[in-house]
A protein has these predicted regions:
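Clamp-loader machinery-focused feature within the broader ASCE/P-loop NTPase space
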Residues: 1-130, 136-139
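Acidic/polar active-site rim loop that often engages polyanionic ligands
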Residues: 79, 158-159
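Structural recognition of the conserved hydrophobic beta-strand(s) that form the central parallel beta-sheet
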Residues: 119-120, 146-151
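Short, well-ordered alpha-helical microsegments
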Residues: 127, 157-158
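Short amphipathic alpha-helical segments
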Residues: 131-132, 159
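The feature captures the ABC ATPase H-loop/switch
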Residues: 153-155
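Conserved small/polar residues in nucleotide/adenosyl-binding loops
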Residues: 160-167
Length: 167
């Protein structure tokens, strides 16, 4: 991992229980090397949602993730129009219409920020046909679109390829 970055955005500083994740994301922010997709893996309560929220704040905040501005508050309340939290709607996972809607939305310009963030929870519940449709979008998103995928295990995630997302 190297040395921890000295200028950690306030939104990421709250990830003190996950120093490797915090430092990795802070370094990417400071160096301007954000990936187009991230895969956060862990059991419920492991901090995936907190890390996804912190990263989204850094991406849409005009102050680089200060954690206290209106944009950051909107992300925290899940009301920011450019940060899309997507959860499985069906009893057995994502429904096809969710994936179609997401793919259609990706090409639209951001409303308030310079980029859009799509946070998909429990991606291991995607069915193969939905995962395949979404994979092309995740591998080749338009400029200014970042995906954060969350799963309990990488093995169960049909979307995961080492080329598609930074783990």
């Amino acid at each position: 991992m190297g040395n921890a970055p000295t200028d950690v955005p306030a939104a990421l500083a709250g990830l003190s229980d996950q120093p490797r994740v915090r430092d990795f994301l802070a370094r990417a922010m400071v160096e301007g090397r954000l990936s187009h997709a991230y895969l956060f893996v862990g059991a419920p309560g492991s901090g995936k949602h907190e890390a996804a929220e912190a990263l989204a704040k850094c991406i849409v905040c005009p102050n680089g993730g200060d954690g206290s501005c209106d944009e950051c508050r909107r992300v925290a309340h899940k009301t920011h129009p450019d940060v899309h939290w997507i959860f499985p709607e069906g009893a057995s996972g994502y429904v096809v219409e969710q994936v179609r809607s997401l793919i259609a939305d990706v090409s639209l310009a951001p409303v308030r920020a310079k980029a859009k963030v799509y946070i998909l929870d429990r991606v291991e519940t995607l069915r193969e046909s939905s995962a395949n449709a979404l994979l092309k979008t995740i591998e080749e998103p338009p400029d200014g679109v970042i995906f954060v995928l969350m799963a309990r295990t990488a093995d169960a995630c049909l979307l995961y390829t080492s080329d598609a997302a930074d783990e």
